[in-house]
């Protein structure tokens, strides 16, 4: 049996990568998958602190900074109760990808790879790169990757002096919002 995909005006044989994507997308709530044999030690401590600070900025009344890491991570859904296994708390796949160490992520998802290339001015060569397994970016998980790449993208935005129709200086903030949303997606 073969799998086909509709592209423009015809049906074409799907590549192995496309089939893999179909299977991934067909899984219900894969991010909430509870992982066996993973603990808080599989998460990057620096990322946990960054995450606590970010959440605390949004919701300062909840005293997240006062919570111990495990209590905080349970409250955020990074660890959830496995109701089929004596109600033990287990790490979610999303929690691993978002806050995990590279070693722990790779042990569960061996093909997981984050990569950002800045090819400004030359499409054949990159001038800046953020990539998994790069010693310049230890324990690169989704949270660290997002923060590093966001800052690098924002640094590339030219901000010339320009006035709008009301003689008010235009800001790069709108472009930053659009770029941030694109990166998140």
Task: List PLM regions with ranges.
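Active-site helix-to-loop segments that bind/position phosphate- or nucleotide-bearing substrates
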Residues: 3-184
């Amino acid at each position: 049996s073969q799998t086909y995909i509709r592209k423009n005006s015809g049906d074409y044989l799907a590549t192995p990568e496309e089939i893999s994507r179909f299977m991934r997308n067909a899984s219900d709530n894969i991010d909430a998958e509870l992982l066996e044999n993973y603990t808080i030690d599989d998460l990057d401590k620096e990322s946990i602190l960054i995450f606590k600070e970010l959440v605390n900025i949004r919701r300062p009344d909840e005293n997240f900074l006062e919570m111990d890491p495990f209590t905080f991570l349970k409250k955020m859904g990074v660890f959830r109760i496995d109701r089929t296994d004596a109600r033990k708390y287990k790490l979610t796949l999303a929690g691993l990808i978002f806050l995990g160490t590279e070693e722990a992520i790779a042990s569960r998802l061996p093909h997981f790879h984050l990569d950002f290339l800045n090819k400004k001015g030359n499409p054949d060569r990159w001038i800046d790169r953020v990539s998994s397994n790069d010693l310049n970016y230890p324990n690169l998980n989704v949270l660290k990757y997002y923060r590093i790449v966001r800052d690098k993208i924002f640094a590339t935005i030219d901000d010339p002096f320009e006035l709008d129709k009301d003689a008010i200086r235009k800001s790069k903030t709108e472009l930053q919002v659009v770029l941030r949303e694109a990166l998140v997606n």
